[in-house]
Design a protein with these regions (language model features):
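Alpha/beta enzyme core
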Residues: 27, 32-34, 39-194
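N-terminal basic, low-complexity leaders that serve as flexible interaction/assembly modules and, when applicable
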Residues: 1-37
Length: 194
């Protein structure tokens, strides 16, 4: 309680944060385990699920999260939307709003919106999530889009999760890849919480 009392978030947002923190095996421990499954869009379903074909069925993804004792499950509109009526009240949903797709060549590291905050709210999601590729040509647009989406999510009472990644070909110099450098990733995370 001492963490949330001073928050400027509305009561419904705090309620949904508590839904996430108070679910699963780690309930109310201060730790969170959310099963993230958006690889089917980011890396193709075949590459992601071929070793375990039962996960082509969205229901099995949610069952895995529940049986694994996760606090929540984060996935796409398609996966969560197809089973929302059966599971949204059993485990907190985090709907991923934007995605990159690998069919465009060359890959542009461009996260685009696949649905709306209102659609996620209507399917019973406790939270929405989004990715920003800091350093990419599209990162400024992504910042504006995600910021506006998260503002609306908070108005509706949803929690928000931001995934911060670095994507810039200039971060590779003389055979060294600096995408995982502490100063660069730290700056991306700092920008993400600002």
């Amino acid at each position: 309680d001492s963490i949330w009392i001073g928050s400027d978030r509305n009561i419904q947002t705090l309620n949904n944060l508590q839904r996430l923190l108070g679910s699963g095996r780690l309930a109310n421990t201060g730790y969170v385990s959310i099963l993230p499954v958006d690889q089917d869009i980011e890396h193709t379903a075949g590459a992601s699920f071929a070793p375990n074909p039962i996960y082509f069925d969205p229901e099995n993804i949610v069952r895995l999260a529940i049986e694994g004792g996760c606090n929540g499950v984060a996935s796409t509109f398609g996966i969560l939307g197809s089973i929302a009526r059966k599971y949204a009240h059993k485990i907190p949903f985090v709907v991923k709003l934007n995605h990159n797709e690998l069919l465009t060549y060359p890959n542009s590291y461009n996260q685009i919106m696949f649905g709306s905050v209102k659609e996620a709210w209507d399917m019973g999601a406790a939270a929405v999530g989004a990715t920003i590729y800091f350093g990419s040509e599209e990162s400024r647009r992504q910042l504006v889009e995600v910021s506006e989406a998260f503002e609306y999510a908070h108005e509706l009472g949803m929690a928000t999760i931001l995934w911060c990644y670095l994507r810039n070909s200039e971060f590779k110099k003389d055979g060294v890849d600096y995408h995982a450098a502490a100063d660069l990733t730290g700056q991306a995370n700092h920008l993400g919480v600002t």
